[in-house]
């Protein structure tokens, strides 16, 4: 039986997926036993939080854990002592040995792909575009857009992002690729224009359609409850939502964390994850960027193929799900974009979007050269 949440434009099932079971999160973060501060007026809540900060009072453990996690998603702070600086350099050197630059190891990567089909998977924020203060201004450069077009003309290519498809497509402006938005919960194939000049999507996959009304409601609630926290921004990503705190003063993080926690208590079918300076809220279905990668490979006919080399490039915690899938498949390469050492399931690293651009350029050049030699 075809899952009712899987939609194909020609009304035919692609994969015959089984019905996806929605589970309830058991995370203690969402425990109903934890008291909410919202019995208090907002001013009183702020005074309590400010008093706790000034007097070094202990914030409730579950919120403290959440704040620590929010700090972990921040860029690594510079340390003052020369000893720590030397230690950091040693750690980075050791990390680079374990996860060498994909540029330095380029020949090793393409040698493994000889005679096989490379399939490219690309995150957006922090990978194709730089991380910026305002998420609405995370524009891709002209050079990056052109190289993505070149990559798409040589390899099956997908952008896998937490953003909505509409938002990321407006940034990228490339039709010849797959878009997997909302952490893979919204997948569309390359578009083409019909005789009337209208675009047609080949594939549309939405395993969380039933959550749309719930997501919309939570977006509205959080927009209302966070508007008094300067710098907080709620973004509707269609099948998930983001609460950005990049521009929020760190002293306000406990208040923001409490707002998010208090809202999610009433929505146990939603779970909280984190990215770089962003809280991600999404359905508790078993679906992530790794599942999206597998879905796309299966759609392309490479589910059980030994002649495919998936390459996934991303910078975020949520990309680790895709890196892990590649490890489990025993094929392909995960490339982490990061300037600082991080725990990762990737095989290689790149420092920033400019290095991603260089890697993609070299990949296109290699492909054109090998085609010319055939």
Curated annotation (Swiss-Prot):
Pathway recorded for this protein: Glycan biosynthesis; trehalose biosynthesis
Coiled-coil parts of chain: none
Cysteines joined through disulfide linkages: none
InterPro entries (alphabetical): HAD-like_sf (IPR036412), HAD-SF_hydro_IIB (IPR006379), HAD_sf (IPR023214), OTSB-like (IPR044651), Trehalose_PPase (IPR003337)
Organism annotation: Arabidopsis thaliana
EC number: 3.1.3.12
Name of the protein: Trehalose-phosphate phosphatase B
Gene Ontology terms: biological process: trehalose biosynthetic process
Catalytic activity as recorded in UniProt: alpha,alpha-trehalose 6-phosphate + H2O = alpha,alpha-trehalose + phosphate
Cofactor: a divalent metal cation
UniProt entry keywords in alphabetical sequence: Hydrolase, Stress response
Single Gene Ontology MF annotation: trehalose-phosphatase activity
Upregulating conditions: By trehalose.
Function description: Removes the phosphate from trehalose 6-phosphate to produce free trehalose. Trehalose accumulation in plant may improve abiotic stress tolerance.
Tissue and organ distribution: Expressed in flowers.
Enzyme class of the recorded protein, top EC level: hydrolase
Family, per entry: Belongs to the trehalose phosphatase family.
